Amino acid sequence: MRILVTNDDGIYSPGLWALAEAASQFGEVFVAAPDTEQSATGHAITIAHPVRAYPHPAPLHGPHFPAYQVRGTPADCVALGLHLFGPVDLVLSGVNLGSNLGHEIWHSGTVAAAKQGYLFGLSAAAFSVPLNGEVPDFAGLRPWLLRTLETLLRLERPFLVNVNLPLRPKGFLWTRQSVRAYEGVVIPGEDPMGRPFYWFASRPLKEAEEGTDRWAVAQGFVSATPLRLDLTDETRLQPALAQE
């Protein structure tokens, strides 16, 4: 099996290499990741200028995989990775430093990279871990990455799955995407030159429902949510068609 690994945190993120190492237990791994952080870029692709890529040097310690650092978005990395390395069977994105739960998947570059692989007809999965004031222990998470990959590879292909791991998992659950309602917050500030700037932040307004991704992670479970790209609202489409 040939596996392409990418992320949105950038080529130097420890989560990227933790996922690549785990994936190497299942096949031949190739890496194409942004040369700088691309968090919250969503499914943006670069069309206004050329995308550049450079071979990434082998690390001094640990396993080495053929790798390119890409001056582009996560979706760019998948498209270019398939060109540079040739056909693959599986696209993995992550492990993102920060959760991608509920409506967060709309702006997630991590999930978008997996979606890009799925758009090419490939099986794909996004992996994320929350940041709750402590650095993720990827060595401790390794058994759960392996177990989750084993589970995903038993699915009918192609598949698209969003995976979120708590910092200390106690089990694995299949979940549905939560509907996360936000209160948008704009935090103003002023730089030393007296110029205004703004931070965008948000606070959740609703508790997570049981069986959802956010609920599962809060309870200490690895959450795996199957996704689809067809966004058609059938409940509204059918009445609309009936009115014609």
Swiss-Prot record:
GO MF terms held by the record: 3'-nucleotidase activity; 5'-nucleotidase activity; exopolyphosphatase activity; metal ion binding; nucleotide binding
GO cellular component: cytoplasm
UniProt binding sites for a divalent metal cation: D8, D9, S39, N96
Named cofactor requirement(s): a divalent metal cation
Organism per entry: Thermus thermophilus (strain ATCC BAA-163 / DSM 7039 / HB27)
Functional summary from the UniProt entry: Nucleotidase that shows phosphatase activity on nucleoside 5'-monophosphates.
Keywords: Cytoplasm, Hydrolase, Metal-binding, Nucleotide-binding, Plasmid
Places the protein is found: Cytoplasm
Reaction(s) the record says it catalyses: a ribonucleoside 5'-phosphate + H2O = a ribonucleoside + phosphate
Enzyme Commission number(s) from the entry: 3.1.3.5
Annotated signal sequence range: none
Family annotation (Gene3D superfamilies): Survival protein SurE-like phosphatase/nucleotidase
InterPro entries from the UniProt entry: SurE, SurE-like_Pase/nucleotidase, SurE-like_sf
Note describing how the cofactor binds: Binds 1 divalent metal cation per subunit.
Pfam families: SurE
Name of the protein in question: 5'-nucleotidase SurE 2
Family: Belongs to the SurE nucleotidase family.
This protein's encoding gene: surE2
